[in-house]
A protein has these predicted regions:
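Short, low-complexity intrinsically disordered segments enriched in A/P/G/S/L with frequent Arg
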Residues: 8-10, 14-15, 214
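Generic low-complexity segments that are intrinsically disordered, proline-rich and/or Lys/Arg-biased
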Residues: 12, 40-42, 64, 191, ...
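Compositionally biased low-complexity segments enriched in histidine and/or tyrosine
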Residues: 2-8
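Intrinsically disordered, low-complexity repeat segments enriched in small/polar residues
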Residues: 4, 15, 220-221
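Conserved, mostly hydrophobic/aromatic
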Residues: 139
Length: 223
């Protein structure tokens, strides 16, 4: 059963900490109160002693290139009808999930506790480590590689990342990567249309020295 009303992305306003406390409160079980909760059965425990150290940004739409169908949620909750679209035959029996899904409107849904291991990365490697699902948080954005993502999605993503950074000290903007970065040659999302420079700018505007104690790297890189 899914809980919480659908809502738009969070506003980009004022004090980071006050807004964070009101909007994205991380509870003792790894769920964020600012997200609609829709538990997926597709998860398992992280290895003992392993906390999130990486955030993987994905892009997804079902059917491909179509938005607002509700079928991404159906896929993550094992309710996708394989006869609903010709593309879905290849997804029959697939068991995948992400911790979060951000719709085109900016609405945020959480499927898996951040304390648990979602099944989003597949065969993957980051730096010297494999099996990125073990130590990562997966965030799916509704979209395709070559279509620009919505400003509301960037706003919600940036606020969510701020909340994650506050909860998990090993996370930082340098540890936010695309699926294509950890599975090159196998995955291409979130694709060339994803604006990494905009995401960095939004995060720098929220995390300022003296406010968080962890200022972001002011690199001018597009990544």
């Amino acid at each position: 059963m899914c809980v919480g009303a659908r809502a738009g992305g969070l506003p980009n306003v004022g004090s980071l900490l006050r807004m964070l406390c009101m909007q994205y409160v991380h509870d003792s079980e790894g769920w964020f109160s600012g997200a609609r909760r829709c538990p997926s059965p597709n998860f398992n425990a992280r290895p003992v002693g392993v906390d999130p150290e990486l955030v993987v940004v994905h892009g997804i739409s079902l059917p491909p290139g179509c938005y607002g169908s509700g079928d991404v949620e159906a896929l993550f909750c094992n309710r996708l009808d394989p006869s609903g679209h010709p593309y879905y035959a290849q997804l029959d029996g697939l068991r995948v999930s992400a911790h979060f899904f951000i719709e085109r409107s900016g609405a945020l849904t959480q499927f898996i506790s951040c304390d648990d291991r979602a099944w989003h990365a597949g065969v993957s490697q980051w730096r010297w480590r494999t099996d990125c699902n073990d130590f990562s948080i997966g965030i799916e954005l509704e979209g395709v590689d070559v279509h620009g993502y919505e400003n509301t999605q960037y706003q919600t993503l940036s606020w969510l990342l701020v909340g994650l950074f506050c909860e998990y000290p090993r996370l930082s903007i340098e540890a936010v990567v695309g699926h294509s970065d950890i599975a090159p040659g196998r995955k291409t999302d979130p694709g060339p249309a994803f604006n990494w420079a905009l995401l960095r700018r939004l995060l720098r505007n929220k995390f300022r020295p003296g406010e968080s104690g962890r200022p972001l790297n002011n690199s001018s890189s597009n990544r």
